[in-house]
């Protein structure tokens, strides 16, 4: 079944990923983009300036794209207008951070409840660095506090929820850049097509549609995000300013490669990915995060250490699986230790919260609370030892 025309997309989060990655592809695919954003200044800028530039940087030079045909709505103060837009949108996307998804659910639920079941179902795609982010969002939307259970009987006529994996490095921006966004040329946006069943998938350039997303999500999270964060946390402890600077240090580069060798062992065995193919993927990732044009500060890449040390994230996720299988995960644990040392970093609330937890709690409590590991898991005692070591060093300082 064909989709509606003219095409309209609602995107939550007008940050760098929202403007520079998701909205760029939606615009190039002929959608009008309505940004849903809570920052008044950003909403005002988007509604005042009728275009902005997306600047792609790489070793082979720079390209610029101009984005137009968009509007912005303050999702906090103008909910009614946003509900109307969602009720008639073809696509609803977001890039707000996994922890914010629960706050989007009420307004999306209202928009979908107001939607005619005669329309093609809205394609809802969360573009977050988290496994199963769209499933998480869907659970919040369909919960009784947000949606009348009676509506769920034919909810597939209102919305199709599809998980995605996104991969693009967007560094901190020049403070004078305004709405313009600088990012790397490389990108990957993979979305599962199976939820669409008899409906046509949305016509969006840049998306690779697949039947099974899990290998793509885990390969990306456990290679790009693991590698990027490992470089940042080692770089921070060794007083490097950018990820590029960190990777010029042979010791740090070796630590990154060792961590990615361990995740490669997991990925190739678990998902049947060819070892040589994964090796080439790893080499490409190391080159990407070594891009001097990105000027990516270690503090930016390392921010939110509590999330990055959590159970399904880039260090503990793969390390726990490797440990259960009796495989080596020592480099991942060393990287996790560096993440535990990312404390009291200016501009990052989670790093202050981590410092407080490390100061006030017993090692076993820290591991269960921060990493979500249970004493029955093989990785548990090894992470307890890391926390003890970091706490001991903090007490000596």
From Swiss-Prot:
Cysteines paired by S-S bonds: none
Oligomeric and partner information: Monomer.
Protein task: Catalyzes the NAD(H)-dependent interconversion of D-fructose 6-phosphate and D-mannitol 1-phosphate in the mannitol metabolic pathway.
Designated name of the protein: Mannitol-1-phosphate 5-dehydrogenase
HAMAP family in alphabetical order: Mannitol_dehydrog
Catalytic activity of the protein: D-mannitol 1-phosphate + NAD(+) = beta-D-fructose 6-phosphate + NADH + H(+)
Gene Ontology molecular function: mannitol-1-phosphate 5-dehydrogenase activity
The keyword Oxidoreductase appears for this protein: yes
Domain of life: Eukaryota
Binding sites annotated in the UniProt record for NAD(+): 9-20
Annotated Pfam families: Mannitol_dh, Mannitol_dh_C
Family: Belongs to the mannitol dehydrogenase family.
This protein's GO CC annotations: cytosol
A GO BP annotation: mannitol catabolic process
Annotated source species: Podospora anserina (strain S / ATCC MYA-4624 / DSM 980 / FGSC 10383) (Pleurage anserina)
UniProt keyword annotations, A-Z: NAD, Oxidoreductase
Gene3D superfamilies given in the database record: N-(1-d-carboxylethyl)-l-norvaline Dehydrogenase, domain 2 (1.10.1040.10), NAD(P)-binding Rossmann-like Domain (3.40.50.720)
Presence of keyword Oxidoreductase: yes
E.C. numbers: 1.1.1.17
Active site: 220
């Amino acid at each position: 079944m064909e989709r509606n025309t003219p095409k309209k997309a609602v995107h939550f989060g007008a940050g760098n990923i929202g403007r520079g990655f998701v909205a760029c592809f939606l615009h190039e695919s002929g959608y009008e983009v309505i940004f849903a954003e809570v920052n008044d200044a950003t909403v005002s800028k988007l509604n005042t300036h009728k275009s902005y530039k997306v600047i792609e940087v790489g070793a082979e030079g720079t390209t610029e794209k101009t984005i137009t045909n968009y509007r912005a709505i303050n999702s906090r103060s103008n909910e009614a207008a946003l509900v109307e837009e969602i009720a008639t949108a073809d696509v609803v996307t977001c890039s707000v951070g996994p922890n914010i998804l629960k706050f989007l659910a009420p307004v999306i639920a209202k928009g979908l409840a107001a939607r005619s079941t005669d329309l093609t179902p809205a394609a809802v795609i969360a573009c977050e660095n988290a496994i199963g982010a769209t499933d998480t969002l869907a659970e919040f939307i369909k919960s009784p506090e947000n949606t009348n259970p009676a509506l769920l009987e034919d909810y597939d006529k209102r919305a199709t929820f599809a998980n995605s994996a996104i991969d693009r490095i967007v560094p901190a921006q020049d403070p004078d850049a305004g709405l313009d966004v600088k990012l790397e040329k490389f990108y990957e946006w993979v979305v599962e097509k199976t939820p669409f069943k008899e409906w046509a998938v949305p016509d969006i350039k840049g998306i690779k549609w697949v039947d099974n997303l899990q290998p793509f999500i885990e390969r990306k999270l456990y290679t790009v995000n693991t590698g990027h964060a490992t470089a940042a946390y080692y770089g921070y402890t060794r007083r490097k300013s950018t990820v590029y600077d960190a990777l010029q240090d042979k010791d740090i580069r070796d630590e990154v490669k060792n961590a990615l060798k361990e995740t490669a062992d997991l990925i190739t065995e678990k998902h049947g990915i060819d070892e040589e193919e994964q090796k080439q993927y790893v080499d490409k990732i190391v080159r990407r995060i070594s891009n001097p044009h990105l000027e990516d500060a270690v503090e930016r890449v390392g921010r939110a250490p509590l999330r990055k040390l959590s159970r399904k994230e880039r260090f503990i996720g793969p390390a726990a699986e490797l440990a259960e299988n009796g495989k080596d995960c020592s480099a991942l644990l060393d990287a996790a230790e560096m993440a535990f040392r990312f404390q009291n970093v200016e501009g990052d609330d989670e790093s202050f919260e981590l410092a407080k937890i490390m100061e006030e709690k017993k090692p076993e409590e820290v591991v269960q609370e921060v990493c979500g590991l249970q004493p029955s898991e093989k990785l548990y005692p090894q992470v307890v030892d890391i926390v003890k070591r970091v706490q001991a060093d903090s007490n000596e300082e």
